[in-house]
Amino acid sequence: MYRILIVDDERIERNGIRFLLKKLNMEFDIDEAVNGLDALEKIHQADYDILLTDVKMPFMDGIELIDNVVNEKKKMRCVIFSGCNEFDYAKRAIRLGVVDYILKPVDPKEFKETLEKVVDELEAAKASDELKSKSMEFLYEHALYMLVNGEDIESIPVSYTHLRAHE
């Protein structure tokens, strides 16, 4: 189950996004925030897989929010949904690595395609992490076997040290 944070200062917009998420027939744990500052607090307190945010909100806009969390929460996927079609916002969003910038009113088909893409990315990242974990486990066991059998630690394959560095 993926955790989603919906951020918009307008309740009707949050409700609309929640409705579209439920129509996807996927399991999501959905939380909401009323502005960027509220969202930032929630993000620091919990792990979210997907951030769906508006741009123009009081206290902290969606671009600032993403800018504040993008380096800290590298695995979280960000999608903007906004009535703001100014090129500068879209350009900044792209630089921050958002998955998509959906204009309001949100087209259900576009929303579905975007969320499917996000879920596919999350699944691929999870599979990659699991593969790395299994590779590390194998290499640890191999290194232990070599040490127990009196082999020199320096003879352990370079791939072991390479994987260890990327843990």
Regions found by a protein language model. Give the residues of each.
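Two-component/phosphorelay signaling modules centered on CheY-like receiver
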Residues: R11-D31, Q45
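Interdomain helical linkers/hinges and coiled-coil/dimerization scaffolds
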Residues: I94, L103-R164
